């Protein structure tokens, strides 16, 4: 995500006010992209890729597959996959920042979260505390190193207990759930364009090529404090979960993602999703984790 930017809350409000003015009104024919669902309570397949065999946790079975690809236009892969069958923790961090800042931030988020959650039972409080601590670490690290100035990362993770999927989310990576054939976006994008969409100031057609579409409004490590979205969703047998960076959903629409997840087992689906993102342009790093819940609540 080397071309992502992060806006402060104050800058975001100034931007909204600006866009409500006459300048924005002249842009009504700006082209197009995707909607965001409201949230309740391959050139080559994989330059680097990982895959876990079905993971057996106490009383619960989960099939897990992950993939990451540098894409067609980036020189480095600043995404990090988060996978621990022992913790039942899975997710994606999509880094940003010059020099090695993006890679440092995403790897730091991954490693810090795995360290801080080791031995913990899944619950929202522990997840909130761990993400907050990771944020503080990365913030202090970039403040102490000029070359890392401005670095940060998105972070979207699933942490599974026997009955619940706890979701922790900051930024514009996404968590989706496929249940009973219906794909649902479980997280809200923390981005300028997503906020404008939610407020009705942009149409989906205007959003796709909006000049601010790569500006995120929250990231891990960019400020001393952080606002984290936390959710708890009931596990159900047959659910398919997808966590991905914007390098996937920015190139592949939700309808196509749903079609692939419904039609193929996780391993094949992961390969096809990477291939579709590359075929769609591969403009960013592409990372994803797919979970098939075999033994959630019946």
Regions found by a protein language model. Give the residues of each.
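PP2C/PPM-type serine/threonine phosphatase catalytic domain
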Residues: 1-298
């Amino acid at each position: 995500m080397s071309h992502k930017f992060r806006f402060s809350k104050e800058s975001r409000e100034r931007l909204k006010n600006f866009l409500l003015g006459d300048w924005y009104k002249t842009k009504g024919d700006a082209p197009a992209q995707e909607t965001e669902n409201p949230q309740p309570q391959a050139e080559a397949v994989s330059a680097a890729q990982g895959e876990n065999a079905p993971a057996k946790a106490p009383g619960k079975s989960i099939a897990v597959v992950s993939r990451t690809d540098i894409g067609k236009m980036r020189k480095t892969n600043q995404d990090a996959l988060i996978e621990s069958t022992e913790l039942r923790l899975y997710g994606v961090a999509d880094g940003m920042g010059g020099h090695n800042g993006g890679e440092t931030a995403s790897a730091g988020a991954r490693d810090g979260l795995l360290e801080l959650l080791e031995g913990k039972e899944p619950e929202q409080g522990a997840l909130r505390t761990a993400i907050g601590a990771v944020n503080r670490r990365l913030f202090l690290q970039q403040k102490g190193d000029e070359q890392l100035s401005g670095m940060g990362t998105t972070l979207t993770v699933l942490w599974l207990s026997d009955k619940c999927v706890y979701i922790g989310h900051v930024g514009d990576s996404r968590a989706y759930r496929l249940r009973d054939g219906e794909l649902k976006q479980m997280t809200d994008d923390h981005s300028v364009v997503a906020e404008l969409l939610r407020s009705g100031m942009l149409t989906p057609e205007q959003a796709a090529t909006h000049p601010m579409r790569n500006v995120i409004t929250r990231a891990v490590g960019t400020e001393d404090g952080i606002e984290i979205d936390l959710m708890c969703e009931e596990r159900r047998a047959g659910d398919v979960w997808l966590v991905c960076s914007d390098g996937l959903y920015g190139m592949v629409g939700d309808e196509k993602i749903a079609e692939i997840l419904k039609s193929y087992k996780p391993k094949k689906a992961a390969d096809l999703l990477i291939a579709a993102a590359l075929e769609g342009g591969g403009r960013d790093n592409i990372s994803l984790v797919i979970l098939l819940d075999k033994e959630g609540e019946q």
